[in-house]
């Protein structure tokens, strides 16, 4: 589900349609793999569990679109509201499918069609295809970056930042050059207010603990795991890194994915 467009689909049956579609894809997989020896295990699992994994992208884009800082109470409100809705509507759709097509073996008597309905994937390619929206639940790594595509390398600008700079009359080559020299950051731009700078913080400028806290908040609505990356400064002591992992575990986060950083030499440049 594209959270950047949440306000456009929140009052529709989009989540229900997505679950219906995923369940139909699973049925096609079961049908087409009948008699395939090498996929017997996968087919049997699909038949017994009918596990789905509806995910999201565009989380950070929604926040920036609405000028909400990632590290804010408003962000946590949206986080809870969006994922609670997706969970409730996913479960409702699975119940409807069970009434129509029946329950799989492992869910007999539970009134559900699918053992799981949600999983948060990385979506790097999908987010690029869908208008350069932010990947999954992850913040943008930069407000100005080079995208390597099949036909060459192209510079990409944060569209919501570009709109803001245009309103302030500073959407020009020199401004973007300074953003590039500051590794995609806008914290040096004196024309922006503190609130605006907070909205356009990059991944490395957002507290890893805030990433973990919001992941823990939404985990209660997600029956599977989240593709959750952390951006940790190379200068952070090992004990502090360890503390982040322990806190994630204590807060109920099921998994952590990449621990991103940069070399000390690059950070000193």
What are these regions (language model features)?
Residues 55-58, 90-94, 241:
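Extended, hydrophobic alpha-helical segments in both membrane/secreted and soluble proteins
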Residues 6-15, 67-74, 156, 173:
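Structural helix-adjacent loops and short alpha-helical linkers that scaffold large soluble proteins
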Residues 17-43, 47, 51, 63-123, ...:
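Internal maturation/activation junctions in enzymes
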Residues 51-58, 125, 157:
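Catalytic-loop motifs flanking and including active-site residues across diverse enzymes
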Residues 1-23, 55:
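Internal glycine-rich alpha/beta core junctions
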Residues 23-34, 118-269:
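Catalytic alpha/beta core of large soluble enzyme barrels
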Residues 6-11, 42-48, 146-147:
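A ubiquitous short alpha-helical element
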Residues 58-62, 78, 160-164:
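A general alpha-helix detector
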């Amino acid at each position: 589900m594209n959270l950047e467009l949440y306000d456009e689909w929140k009052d529709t049956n989009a989540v229900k349609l997505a679950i219906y579609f995923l369940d139909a894809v699973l049925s096609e997989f079961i049908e087409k793999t009948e008699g395939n020896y090498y996929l017997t295990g996968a087919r049997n699992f699909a038949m017994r569990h009918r596990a789905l994994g509806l995910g999201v992208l565009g989380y950070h884009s929604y926040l920036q679109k609405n000028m909400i800082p990632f590290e804010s109470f408003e962000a946590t409100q949206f986080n809870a509201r969006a994922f609670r809705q997706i969970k409730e509507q996913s479960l409702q759709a699975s119940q409807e499918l069970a009434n129509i097509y029946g329950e799989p073996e492992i869910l007999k008597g539970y009134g559900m069609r699918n053992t799981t309905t949600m999983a948060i994937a990385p979506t790097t390619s999908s987010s690029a295809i869908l208008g350069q929206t932010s990947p999954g639940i992850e913040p943008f790594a930069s407000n100005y970056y080079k995208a390597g595509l099949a036909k060459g390398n192209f510079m990409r600008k944060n569209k919501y930042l570009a709109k803001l700079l245009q309103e302030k009359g500073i959407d020009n080559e020199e401004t973007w050059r300074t953003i590039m020299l500051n590794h995609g950051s806008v914290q040096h731009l004196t024309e922006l207010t503190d609130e605006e700078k907070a909205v356009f913080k990059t991944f490395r400028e957002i507290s890893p603990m805030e990433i973990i806290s919001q992941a823990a908040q939404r985990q209660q609505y997600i029956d599977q795991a989240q593709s959750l990356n952390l951006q940790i400064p190379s200068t952070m002591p090992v004990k502090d890194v360890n503390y982040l992992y322990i806190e994630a575990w204590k807060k109920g986060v099921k998994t952590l994915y990449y621990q991103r950083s940069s070399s000390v030499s690059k950070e000193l440049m």
